[in-house]
Structures are given as C-alpha cells and as structure tokens.
Amino acid sequence: MFELLFLGTSASAPSVHRGLAAQVVMVKEYRFLIDCGEGTQRQILRSGIGFKKLNRILITHGHLDHILGLAGLLSTFIRWESMEELEIYGGKAALDRVYDLVHGIVLHGEEPPVPIHLVDLKPGIFFDDKDFSVSAFPVTHRGPG
C-alpha cells in the first residue's frame, strides 16, 4: 500500500499555514521525496517520519520553490553522516540548477562525502520493483527549469 504525506503544498512563496512544495511517497521499504522547497526539513521533523531511508529525491521541475530546500537537507545529511548515497532524479534543466546549488553552494567545490547521483530522467519507467514502478513524463510549466 502507498502512503502519501504532504509536507508542503504552497506555490512560489510559503504562507503562514503552508510550506513550499514537498511530498513523501512511502511504499514498502522505499521513501521518495517529491520536490524539496524551503522548509522541507522542518516539515519532515514535524511529521515524525524522520530522515532515514530518504535517499531518493524526485524533482518535478527546477523552479526555486521546488529545489531550495535541498541545500539545507543535504547539509544535514552530510553533517549527520546518515546517508550512504543519494539519488536525485529530474529533467536536465532541473538537474542543472540542482547541480549548481549542491556543488556551488552546499559543497562549495569540495567532493561530497557520499556519492550524489543526479539522474537525468527520460519519459518512461525509471524505478522498477516487483510490486510497483515509477514513471517519468514531461511537464510544461512557465519559465526556465
């Protein structure tokens, strides 16, 4: 059975009651974080699900309200040494922005302490388990990313 947890549902800017885009899909032993807007770490802590096994991040598009939370989240993962590797999935334009954020700001040109895999998605299945699969499809959204 799938469980979907909405961490943030606001757009462009947070509101008093809503954080920026972030959801977690939990199925079996897998957890997929979909988008990572600012405030995602706080929302994860408030939800009680914790950070363990949160090593697959799916980015719907590269707008800042969907990726800026990655900086703090990755910084926490690095500080806590709680991750063996991290996979970030997205389209090329989104991953270009994620790369700049991760390598330019978070790591500041240093090598990551754990492998960080930026996976350029093409339409179709990209994650396949015997009981479920995850597919990518193109989205049209205004602006770059």
Predicted regions and their residues:
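Binuclear metal-dependent hydrolase catalytic cores
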Residues: 1-145
